[in-house]
C-alpha cells in the first residue's frame, strides 16, 4: 500500500480553488475538497490508476481528474507525491509542474 504525501504547494492550490468557489457556494467548495481527498486516497491501493496527461507524454507524472480540477502526482517507490492541483480548463504550465517537483526526493 502506497503512502500519500501532499506537498505544501499542492495543498495551497487546492485551498485557493476552494476559497474561490466558496465565495459563491461554500457547500460546493467543501464537497469538491472532500471528493478530491477521496479520489487521491484511492491511489494508496491503485497508484497507477491515474491517467498520463496528454501534455506530458514520456514524463513520469500522472493525473486524476475531479472536475473542475486536475491533480498531478508521481510515484516514487511506496510514496505518491501530490504535486499540483489546477483548474481543468486552464492550460498546464509544464515548467511550473517540474519546478514543484524539485523539492521532492527522487
Where are the regions a protein language model picked out?
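Arg/Lys-rich, positively charged N-terminal/basic patches that mediate binding to nucleic acids
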Residues: 1-33
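Conserved protein kinase catalytic domain
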Residues: 11, 18, 37-40, 83-86
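Short, hydrophobic secondary-structure boundary micro-motifs
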Residues: 30-31, 51-54, 94
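Short proline/glycine- and basic residue-enriched helix-capping loop/turn segments at helix->loop/beta transitions
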Residues: 44
Amino acid at each position: 500500500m502506497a503512502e500519500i504525501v501532499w506537498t505544501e504547494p499542492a495543498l495551497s492550490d487546492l485551498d485557493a480553488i476552494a476559497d474561490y468557489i466558496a465565495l459563491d457556494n461554500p457547500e460546493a467548495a467543501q464537497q469538491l475538497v472532500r471528493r478530491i481527498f477521496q479520489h487521491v486516497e484511492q491511489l494508496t491501493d491503485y497508484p497507477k490508476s491515474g491517467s498520463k496527461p496528454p501534455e506530458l507524454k514520456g514524463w513520469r507524472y500522472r493525473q486524476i481528474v475531479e472536475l473542475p480540477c486536475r491533480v498531478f502526482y508521481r510515484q516514487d517507490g511506496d510514496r505518491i507525491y501530490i504535486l499540483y492541483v489546477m483548474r481543468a480548463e486552464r492550460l498546464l504550465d509544464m515548467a511550473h509542474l517540474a519546478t514543484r517537483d524539485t523539492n521532492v526526493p527522487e
